[in-house]
């Protein structure tokens, strides 16, 4: 089990020799698709000559785009797009409304696919699977749930035995839902390839919520359930403290709980809505790489390099989240824990291991600073709606390069929703965007935007964006210092609170230690570099309030709160 005492792996600060750079990502081909309303794509599967993309169409787009749907309500659609030149081939509509719908290929039946999401049955919104053929004909559908329905959708998975796992957050038992512990609990079902229910499972406690965010296949035939949860009282998910945790649950193939682990913040600032969430698992030979997001620098994130920020830059607003990656050993003890992002919200989508032991990470960002240096080429304003973000790290979590992708200028509104890996260098990426008026802006160069055929139509509705990228970075030219030996991150900081100076005493002498004092607006108000074991910072002229003190050298990387009285 994971050690209760927190240890963090203390990375070297890569100063002038830091090897981050705007990535040499080449977009080989791309195209946009949609109508005059929002057409949101969520998932993609690959066949030999084409892709199938699944998404959701708003009523305003019905009858105006590539896919012609009937009715005046949201519709789920599937688009068939050629692989060679990204031409729209055909598409089909289905009378279900499902955010985050997933499409999976049935590996046991050529030309058949599963659409997995939600649909109104039992008089409420519940978990649904539709089986379709290669012509878009519905073969069958099944629905699981109860008359109360679910509140939020969860993770979906095509399993190694050809079945489907679907999940959502439920508040009431009944129907297919065997038990609810309290609040919002995560409920999962597994059915076979013919739609027959094999098992159902509730994950939760008496806390307000336990949400299933993702479900992944384990190499032993079982499953990983990625969650965000509070935890207390009766239930089968218990975490050490009552706070928002990133929790991973390991299930057997039969849906039985084998173990669960909780990670996250120490809840040192509950008024700032400190929280963490589990998103992704990569199995390694010597452990795991876990992925999620978090908005703190305490608990399991102490020394992780979280980038301070508040929502909309409000002085008293909730903290913003970074992408959080942490490597653990086979006993799930943390080896290193690192954050990536800037002072706004950053979100993880998917992580792939590369042949050299490193990782390529796909996500989305609203940040324009910190690790997100490449945002400058898109030139977004502070109220931007986000861009896609890709970055590469080595096996020790050192950032090698990063790249934002999207249209340029103003509010932006680009997101990555699914990725197909072809090899370490090539990926097909699915996303959504507001197509630029000319079809070309920033990284976007589309000839198929719906607005191009109707210049008078407002340019604020979303199309979906399909593009193929190649990583052209020469990794033989990149080197980073070896990681230091793991030790506990500690430093004595006093007096705290203080009304004039704050002293720092390190555990060991160091040649160059950097200190930065940051106010609650994210501004560096004092800094100093010193050699030796101790030094101090002057705070007498600073306004009263809370500050963050960052201390970094070759052995120590930590952040502490300092109160100026």
Q: Where in the sequence are the language-model features?
A:
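Helix-centric, low-specificity signal for extended rod-like, repetitive segments
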Residues: 11, 98, 319, 553-554
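A sequence-level/structural motif corresponding to short, flexible coil/turn segments enriched
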Residues: 22-481
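A detector of low-complexity, intrinsically disordered, Ser/Thr/Gly/Pro/Ala-rich segments
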Residues: 6, 18, 62, 126-127, ...
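C-terminal outer-membrane/trafficking sorting elements
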Residues: 484-494, 498-565
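Bacterial Sec-dependent N-terminal signal peptides
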Residues: 1-27, 480, 503, 523, ...
């Amino acid at each position: 089990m994971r050690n209760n005492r927190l240890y963090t792996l203390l990375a070297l600060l890569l100063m002038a020799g830091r090897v981050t750079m705007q990535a040499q990502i080449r977009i080989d081909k791309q195209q946009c698709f949609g109508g005059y309303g929002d057409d949101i794509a969520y998932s993609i599967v690959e066949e030999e000559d084409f892709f199938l993309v699944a998404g959701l169409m708003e009523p305003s787009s019905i009858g105006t785009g590539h896919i012609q749907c009937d009715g005046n309500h949201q519709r789920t659609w599937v688009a068939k797009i050629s692989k060679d030149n990204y031409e729209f081939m055909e598409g089909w509509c289905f009378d279900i409304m499902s955010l985050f719908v997933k499409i999976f290929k049935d590996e046991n039946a050529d030309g058949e696919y599963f659409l997995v999401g939600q649909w109104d049955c039992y008089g409420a919104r519940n978990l649904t699977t539709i089986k379709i053929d290669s012509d878009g004909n519905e073969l069958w559908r099944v629905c699981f749930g109860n008359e109360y329905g679910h509140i939020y959708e969860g993770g979906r998975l095509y399993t190694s035995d050809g079945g489907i796992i679907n999940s959502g957050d439920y508040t009431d038992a009944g129907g297919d839902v065997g038990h609810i512990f309290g609040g919002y609990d995560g409920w999962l079902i597994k059915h076979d390839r013919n739609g027959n229910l094999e098992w159902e499972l509730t994950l939760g406690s008496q806390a307000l919520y336990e949400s299933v965010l993702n479900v992944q296949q384990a190499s032993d035939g079982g499953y990983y359930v990625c969650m965000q949860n509070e935890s207390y009282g009766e239930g089968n998910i218990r975490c050490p403290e009552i706070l928002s945790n990133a929790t991973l649950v390991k299930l057997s193939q039969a849906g039985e709980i084998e173990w669960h682990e909780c990670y996250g913040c120490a809840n040192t600032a509950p008024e700032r809505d400190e929280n963490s969430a589990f998103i992704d698992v990569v199995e390694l030979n010597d452990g795991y790489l876990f992925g999620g997001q978090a908005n703190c620098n305490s608990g399991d994130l102490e020394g992780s390099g979280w980038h301070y920020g508040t929502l909309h830059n409000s002085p008293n607003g909730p903290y913003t989240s970074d992408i959080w990656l942490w490597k653990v050993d086979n006993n799930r003890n943390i080896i290193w824990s690192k954050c990536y992002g800037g002072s706004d919200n950053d979100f993880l989508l998917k992580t792939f291991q590369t042949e050299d032991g490193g990782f390529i990470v796909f996500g989305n960002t609203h940040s324009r600073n910190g690790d997100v240096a490449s945002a400058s080429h898109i030139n977004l304003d502070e109220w931007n709606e986000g861009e896609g973000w890709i970055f590469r790290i080595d096996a020790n979590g050192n950032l090698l390069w990063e790249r934002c992708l999207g249209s340029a200028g103003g509010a932006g509104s680009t997101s990555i929703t699914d990725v197909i890996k072809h090899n370490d260098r090539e990926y097909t990426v699915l996303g959504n965007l507001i197509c630029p008026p000319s079809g070309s802006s920033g990284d976007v160069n589309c000839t198929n935007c719906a607005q191009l055929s109707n210049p008078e139509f407002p340019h604020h509705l979303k199309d979906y964006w399909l593009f193929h990228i190649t990583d052209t970075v020469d990794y033989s030219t990149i080197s980073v210092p070896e990681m230091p030996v793991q030790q506990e991150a500690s430093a004595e900081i006093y007096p705290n609170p203080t009304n004039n100076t704050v002293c720092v005493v390190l555990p060991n002498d160091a040649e160059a230690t950097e200190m930065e004092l940051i106010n609650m607006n994210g501004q560096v108000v004092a800094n100093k570099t010193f050699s030796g074991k101790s030094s101090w910072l002057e705070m007498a002229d600073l306004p009263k309030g809370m500050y963050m003190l960052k201390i970094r050298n070759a052995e120590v990387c930590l952040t502490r709160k300092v109160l100026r009285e």
